[in-house]
Amino acid sequence: MCIRDSSRSVGKIYCAPGNAGIAAQAECVPLKETQIPELVEFAKEHGVDLTVVGPEVPLSAGIADAFTKAGLRIFGPSAAAARIESSKDFAKRLMEKYDIPTASFKTFDNYADAIEYVSRHSFPVVLKYDGLAAGKGVVIPETFSDAQAALKDMLLDDKFGKGKVVVEEYLTGPEFSFMCFVNGEEVFPLAIAQDHKRAFEGDKGPNTGGMGAYSPVPVITAEDEEYTLEHIMRKTAAAMVAEDCPFKGLLYGGLMK
């Protein structure tokens, strides 16, 4: 949409489902992001040349696969490749297998087993719901009772849906986001940013989908950026190719220095 006014090649922009804030720049389409067959038909009927997918949910549900099968161009990974975002357990195991730097972890689908494991570790600890949770599936309990409550939410009460929990080592340091355009093993980095996920001032409160972000990030040096690109982002792209699920789209790395 940003280049629409300056590009003669862009004639029409549709947004599904859209909202009042975007209506001045695009024609809003009354289709939900999860209505994949209907979105395919809409793209066919309206001669849409390129579809760009933002949310993770339709990607994990296979919207890119459906569009590709229909002969439609789409920017976004296949459902198999989208597991790098939709399953923290998949991502952690991939990094472990291909020696990509990551915090130590263990995955559980049983509440009692998770509780027993957590009880033997020092706090804080990091608990991550395996699936998609709109940026709210990570909890950092400071005490055992907090961990019990969070694990109950995730494994017994299915707060985010039926799934597993990744129990991860707690690390400290500046967090940053590194996004890259990826096409198989081709990796093209964007500028590093730092977003703020906690709901309240002073990095307090529960995690959100994001309260704000800024770029560049002074604490991340050129050497940090080069290391991250070579040892994490490029290695991850190569690992996905090796696993026969090459990533095509925008790969997001949530990292810590």
At which residue positions do the language-model features occur?
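A conserved helix-loop-beta module that forms one wall/lid of the active-site cleft
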Residues: 75-137
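Glycine-rich phosphate-binding loop signature in dinucleotide/nucleotide-binding domains
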Residues: 43-48, 120-121, 161
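General beta-strand structural signal in soluble alpha/beta enzymes
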Residues: 15-16, 52-53, 74-77, 104-107, ...
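ATP-binding N-terminal substructure of ATP-dependent carboxylate-amine bond-forming enzymes
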Residues: 1-79, 112
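Internal nucleotide-binding/catalytic subdomain
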Residues: 140-257
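Short, charged, surface-exposed secondary-structure boundary motifs
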Residues: 24-25, 40, 83-89, 200-202
